[in-house]
Amino acid sequence: MTTRYRVEFASSRPTGKFFTARLNGQTNIFQIEWIKGLLAVPFVLHSQPTAVYQEHSENLVAVAADTHQRYAEIFRDVEKLIDDHSRPLAPPPPPVLASHLTLSVDHERNAAPGKSKLKLLVPTAGSFFSRLPLEDAFKYQDAKRMISRRRFVAPSFNDIRLTLNTAQLLGLVRGPGLDLVTFDGDVTLYDDGACLTPDNPAIPRIIRLLHQGVRIGIVTAAGYTEGAKYYERLKGLLDAVHDSSSLTPAQKDGLVVMGGESNFLFRFDSASPHRLSYVPRPEWLLDEMKSWNQEDITQLLDIAESSLRACAANLNLPVAVLRKDRAVGVYPYDRSKIHREQLEETVLVVQNTVERSVVGSRLPFCAFNGGNDVFVDIGDKSWGVRACQRYFGGIEPSRTLHVGDQFLSAGANDFKARLASTTAWIASLTETVQLLDELEEMQKAEKNRS
């Protein structure tokens, strides 16, 4: 069992770039590297890399089975830590069992979030919107990725990231169900800077979700004020929904586009030549967003623009400044490629500058690395996802899934979505398609089981 191992969270931080996965919950930042450290112990003890075996020998099969068991135990222990820390969907235990030692303490529910073992091991862990069946998720991914059979390559960052995604899907399917799926645009649904074309493999999967009655939101950083611009980027999906004979008008109405992170909402409209109609802000603004006044918005963007110009000059970046209604950013005017380190430096400088301003302390904003540009938007994707939830009648975070590719703390705009919903961290359109296929597979399995 993993209780044999001495877990030192502080020493588990790698000396290189520090990756963190945002699961579901308020301020939940669960360290993938921490889980990686836990799995490193059985890998070192049981992998047998120097043994001279035939690759299909009985000895190797036995080693793989033993390693699988050890990995599964670790994921089960972490799953129990999360249940102990925060189990929002679990019914209260019968009074007769309330004092039994094996029951979850459920510190979040009992107003003692800082006292859980998970909080002691991972101080940044917050509350969770759903359960995470990590042991079952690992067994699912192990069957696909053969993690336990590897003798020279330890469980990787991507192995754990995809296992967490699977656990999140299992938690939704087995728990409250799914009413809303929101997607990032670039990288998640199409290549960076590209468009959603008619042959995109995600389209039939999204239509399948709409057919199930699941609402769909495209929550993108692209801050256009006209539907025509979004039609250019999302034409393949919008035309497919328009032409679909299997979708009812009500199901088609379940598609919206939130632009500028959280600033412009468009609903699907079959009668519009651009398949989209602008939704006036009073129909979807959250109460907190109504206090964002134009004077503060202008002041924050002025500070951000000044910081962007200063940083571009300091780093000698070949960029132009683009000021929009609710955003400001820099992009290469000669289409040259800017180094990632320069983009991240710009993000952090601007973010720090705006955060230290008076207006930055009262007005939400998001500074992010767009791949070859840097932008600052008013609001962020947590507000965008929450606005979609409100527009569709008040969908709960526990019944919402946000799919995106940017979940690093610095310069990543999907990072904040974890405050409003459960999340899945993908790295490409291919992974998005695989995730949606996994979801369908799990839904069918759960239906057959019930």
From Swiss-Prot:
Its cofactor is Mg(2+). One of its GO terms (molecular function) is ATP binding. Keywords: ATP-binding, Hydrolase, Magnesium, Metal-binding, Nucleotide metabolism, Nucleotide-binding. Its EC number is 3.1.3.99. InterPro entries: HAD-like_sf, ISN1. IMP binds at D184, D186, D192, T220, D373, K381. It catalyses: IMP + H2O = inosine + phosphate. The active site is at D184, D186. Allosterically activated by ATP. ATP binding is a prerequisite to magnesium and substrate binding. ATP binds to 2 of the subunits in the homotetramer inducing a closure of these 2 subunits and the release of the C-terminal loop, thereby activating the enzyme. ATP binds at K144. Mg(2+) binds at D184, D186, D405. It comes from the Eukaryota. Pfam families: ISN1. One of its GO terms (biological process) is nucleotide metabolic process. Belongs to the ISN1 family. Homotetramer. IMP-specific 5'-nucleotidase involved in IMP (inositol monophosphate) degradation. This is IMP-specific 5'-nucleotidase 1. It comes from Aspergillus fumigatus (strain ATCC MYA-4609 / CBS 101355 / FGSC A1100 / Af293) (Neosartorya fumigata). The gene is isn1.
